[in-house]
Amino acid sequence: MQLSANQQRIIGCLLEKQSTTPEHYPLSLNALTNACNQKSNRAPVLNLTDSEVQIALDELINARLVTIDEGLSGRVNKYDHRFCNTEFSSLKFSAQQRAIICLLLLRGAQTPGELKTRCARLANFNSVDDVELALNKLIESDIVTKLAREPGKRDCRYMHLLGEQPISEITRPAEQATDELKSEELNELLAEVDELKTELQKIKAHLGL
């Protein structure tokens, strides 16, 4: 299986949204385009048009990796993957393996530690060892490969083998990986601070302060 960059992003988004927002799944073309272009949990950030997403969708439909779900109304086509864990797919993953594949499709090569941090909404890993165990199973199935350790880094990154990867991603500087993870952690902390501020305002309003 060799997926183009746009096809990888679409499959990754369908896997992600099926797990994180099942009430809104399958996805319409508009929802899928928004998912492909969202800035969080994506690397690189894309700016695909509806037409570009539709072209990649049609290719995936022809490859029997995506199907159209017309729904009860039949007015808006919605798209559902047949990539894995369905009666139409030969790929069968555990919840942990599925989460890893999803993130590798959405963000490219990552270390086990990065995967554990980012998998929270997709699957539960008790430790980095659990991540490495799932990765090794995927390596045995020729779905994932382990990259050479980068200079100055303790951990190796892992990359999926479902399509071509940019050379720049395979040879990414170590500093960039660290900066990306720090930025992600900072954004999560800022979001938590905003939530706490909102709760504090509600408490003050309730107490008449």
Curated annotation (Swiss-Prot):
Disulfide bonds: none annotated. The lineage of its organism: Bacteria, Pseudomonadati, Pseudomonadota, Gammaproteobacteria, Alteromonadales. This is UPF0502 protein PSHAa0076. Belongs to the UPF0502 family. It holds the Pfam family DUF480. It comes from the Bacteria. InterPro entries: DUF480, WH-like_DNA-bd_sf, WH_DNA-bd_sf. It comes from Pseudoalteromonas translucida (strain TAC 125).
